[in-house]
């Protein structure tokens, strides 16, 4: 009797385990060029289960509608990003104004495909924790145009974000944008011919390193803006990037905050705190290599703090800068200073420490409500003892393993 009871118990345990076990992860392969290729692609994203991989074959999908993914722990993997050989999602004929791909689930891995010519954002993720953007190309192939989509890759309201080896060209706002998020790494990526190359906005704890931000209007922006659910951006490190020739005329639609970014801006820090800018290579940024400013626009947010605080600029290499300052009065200031302004420009609001052996120009506007036309540009020294260095951002090991 005892043996029979044990055998029955073992059988019940086996059945329970079988029922509780998740289905084995599978690969859903999708081919381009078939009559129903578009439907099969969206169907694969809908039917995918946690652990699955949606595998995109080489070829071009001519898409008229945006795609979406709302299943956790899914990989979307293509065959490459190059025209003629990779997996190309072409939205040139898109009917609506939405994004190309919208992700709203956790633990998603996007890798090795291209998204072209979306009417809205290229790839957007919202509330998608532990998301990885890897080896992607997002491009508006006709180059800078006001009618291009706003953002290339656009994670927002997320924790643990990795953007690695991504190429973005032609975004009318920011090529690589991370907003209202926490614990962020943007690395080994290229942003070119966007209004803002890379932008970290209203976010906490970010490392932006080993990127190339070239031929944008502004290379790398670190902003904090009012009237958003998450504000008080802080603890951002911008280091070991190449920030050069950011000379593209600003083509952002009027009314966007980035429409105010002067052509020729290298790194622009606005109203953030605890930001370190170090080890970067700057060259050929006509307005300034580094700008540090307060938020000088009308707002109705009583909790908003508009000043930059604890900004540290150190150990950077400065090439030519300040020879074509594109802000109001900039040309006159440059002429008065012999043809160029110093590589570092501070509006005089908040506080900053600049340890680089280059000139710093202050506009002497400590109150952000003071009109810009009351600026009194003066060379200044901003030496001092910086606060303790910010720590390196660590992402979950499971995220790093995906890109190894």
Task: Indicate where each model-derived feature is located.
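Extracellular beta-strand/beta-solenoid scaffold signature
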Residues: 41-42, 64, 90-101, 117-124, ...
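Right-handed parallel beta-helix
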Residues: 77-79, 106-117, 129-142, 159-172, ...
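Right-handed parallel beta-helix/beta-spiral solenoid domain characteristic of secreted/periplasmic
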Residues: 26-39, 53, 73-119, 142
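Acidic, glycine- and Ser/Thr-rich low-complexity intrinsically disordered tracts
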Residues: 298, 303-404
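The right-handed parallel beta-helix/beta-solenoid scaffold, focusing on the short coil/turn
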Residues: 26, 52, 59, 65, ...
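Short, T/G/N/S-enriched strand-turn elements that build extracellular solenoid repeat scaffolds
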Residues: 39-47, 62-71, 127, 232, ...
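Bacterial N-terminal signal peptides that target proteins for export
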Residues: 1-10
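Bacterial N-terminal signal peptides
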Residues: 9-20
